[in-house]
């Protein structure tokens, strides 16, 4: 059962998050991801993302992240402290799939909404429960205006934990 009384609703500017564009043919990127990450990327569409991770040869998690498909682009949304780990590992496989990786200069906004709130067309569902859901939105033009319904980064992290997600910290990688 979800401890819903502790969930806080609103939006957060995820300043410590990086968006990485995996550039290539749709199927090439899909095949790359299917072979390297822990989620089923065939379930991803314009509004539904996946929480995923990348493991080393021993099966230990190197980093975790979200995968979304935004405006015909495969994006990896990852903590900035872990982006180099992801890039160092995935770069080994890029030439085999004719895919490149590019760090984008986009703002990433996280939303925690109750079930009655409508998801906007530019949002990507990443976590869902009976009471609430979490989405990500890419603000490539830096147009999002902060308002009174802003969440702290700590509230966003707590919401993720309440909903069953564990974010790997840099010191936990590969353990």
Positions of PLM-derived features:
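Basic, glycine/lysine-rich polyanion-binding surfaces/domains
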Residues: 1-175
